[in-house]
Amino acid sequence: MVNILHIDSSPRAERSHSRELSKEFVSAWRAAHPEDAIAYRDLGHHPVPHVNEAWIAAAFSPPETHTPELAEAIRVSDELVDEFLAADRYVFGVPMYNFNIPSTFKAYIDQIVRINRTVSLDAQGFRGLVEGKKAVIITARGGDFSATSPAVAYDFQEPYLRTIFGFIGITDIQFINANSLNEGDARTQSLAEARAAIQDAIAQW
């Protein structure tokens, strides 16, 4: 049995392309692999807290030294990290906002990138602790940020996500980018291509 963590980050509901596509991926996977367990987290509708001063103090001090206040400050982060580490694979639905990810998803990443939980630091430098896992990241973009587009230089979304998840040890990442979703006929073609990519990804995942 494979444990999958499915996360959406769009604040939109029915009109969200990233939600629609990530749901299609998970539904198709569930149909093909009914024995697998799928956990779901909706960051768009149920955002996690941003880090604050108490969180930082707790994250960079031994748990046995925590006061009740520091223990409470880090409690949600501990729960999120536990959930994250319990998964074998990840499906993320991520819209592009201002060339990058929604702040809700950034807040989540800040909560799970934790010294001695998901990344370690020693004399040799940083080492990701989340190894041997896979991720599919489904993005939705209003414009064309594909590799052949002049606007690709504005795509800070995919490079950031590759970097931050690679930093904690997840390097087996497949992106399914739905571009040009604000462009009429191009939207229809882009969604069709994304759906085809979803089927290919499921066959290979």
Curated annotation (Swiss-Prot):
Recorded catalytic activity of this chain's protein: 2 a quinone + NADH + H(+) = 2 a 1,4-benzosemiquinone + NAD(+); N,N-dimethyl-1,4-phenylenediamine + anthranilate + 2 NAD(+) = 2-(4-dimethylaminophenyl)diazenylbenzoate + 2 NADH + 2 H(+)
Listed name of the protein: FMN-dependent NADH:quinone oxidoreductase
Cofactor note: Binds 1 FMN per subunit.
Uppermost EC category: oxidoreductase
Top-level taxon in the UniProt lineage: Bacteria
PANTHER family (UniProt xref): FMN-DEPENDENT NADH-AZOREDUCTASE 1, FMN-DEPENDENT NADH:QUINONE OXIDOREDUCTASE
GO molecular function: electron transfer activity; FMN binding; oxidoreductase activity, acting on NAD(P)H as acceptor; oxidoreductase activity, acting on NAD(P)H, quinone or similar compound as acceptor
Keywords: Flavoprotein, FMN, NAD, Oxidoreductase
Residues the entry annotates as binding FMN: 10, 16-18, 96-99
Cofactor(s) it depends on: FMN
EC number(s) stated in the UniProt entry for this protein: 1.6.5.-, 1.7.1.17
Organism: Nostoc punctiforme (strain ATCC 29133 / PCC 73102)
